[in-house]
Amino acid sequence: RVNIASGEKTVLVSFAQLRDALIADGHSEVSALFINHTLWNRDGGRIYFYARGGWDGNKGARINQPFTVNADGSDLTLQRGFIGGHPEWEMGHRAIGGQDDKLVIYDTDLQEVVDQIADPTIIEKPGGDSSLSPDGNWIVTGYGKGGHNMWVVYRRTDGAWIRTPEYDQRPYVSGDLRSDPAPLWNRDGSKILFPSLTADGSRQLHIIHLNI
């Protein structure tokens, strides 16, 4: 954890702690680990992340294990429920992610799925990138199909939704230079920012304007 104003750094979790937690959970071999998809929850009290190992051709057993930890480094918890894609926090200690082709809400205290958002016919491939609006009433999910990215904007209060046109991402569909959907809300919840390729092949930022 880094204090932006002062630059003060605090180690919340060590790789040794993660290794010990994985071994205690039954992993006989723990390869070199790295941390991915680190997310603060909305009140700043809890952090969600994945401990990963054995990826991208590196030696050792493949590991993809979610954890949570409090913002002061206490209560490191191996999460036994798994939600895929790039997770997002809902309210409190509940996270949003993909499971069994559904966009679900996962309670990190109960360690179980407690709700579902929309229907798979509306939000396809929920293992992509999702972003919740500041007021929690809207969610946007981006996903890829056939080399193209598209986004679904869904209003949770009444189920209204819209899907954007397809944006061609070829040849940047996979690999380190891939064009991920990665939507982001502005602070007042009126616009959504996403990266995408344009007709001339350059990578630009795009904005979805919500008229509500």
What residues fall within each predicted segment?
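Residue-level marker for isolated small/hydroxyl-bearing positions within beta-strands
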Residues: 50, 98, 141-142, 195
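Structural motif
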Residues: 1, 56-67, 100-105, 146-153, ...
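Blade-terminus and WD-like Trp-Asp/Gly-His loop motifs, strongest in beta-propeller folds
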Residues: 37-48, 87-97, 129-138, 183-191
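Loop/turn-rich, solvent-exposed surfaces of beta-rich toroidal or solenoidal domains
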Residues: 101-104, 120-161
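Conserved blade-ending motifs and adjacent loop-strand segments that build the rim/top face
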Residues: 80-85, 117-130, 159-184
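Blade-level signature of beta-propeller repeat domains, shared across WD40, Kelch, NHL, RCC1
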Residues: 179-212
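Surface-exposed loop and turn segments in beta-propeller and other repeat-based domains
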Residues: 7-31, 118-122, 163-175
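Short loop/turn segments that connect beta-strands within beta-propeller blades
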Residues: 3-7, 70-74, 108-111, 156-159, ...
